[in-house]
């Protein structure tokens, strides 16, 4: 049985531990470590691409960057990031970037939480 402190941590976790467990079961600790490492490098690049596209008023570039980040976020169970990306992607797909800067701000804040959580998960239990 989980202790209450661990349950509280799980409730506020920025990633879904079930998604990480599925990856661990599918490919072992090495696959999970590799996917986390790739995400921790690629996510900031995707966020920067989204920001650049947004600054250039490039709707298609914004949509593409957010779509890419959405997919990788879902794979690692970062569902708040996934939903924020989805909202921004949908707005861009509809031809509007209204509200997208605020979504990207939120994404950057959420990524900071996810990055810390995934780095800890990678270091603790991915063998």
Question: For the regions a protein language model found, what residue spans apply to each?
Answer:
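Two-component system phosphorelay core
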Residues: 1-64, 68-127
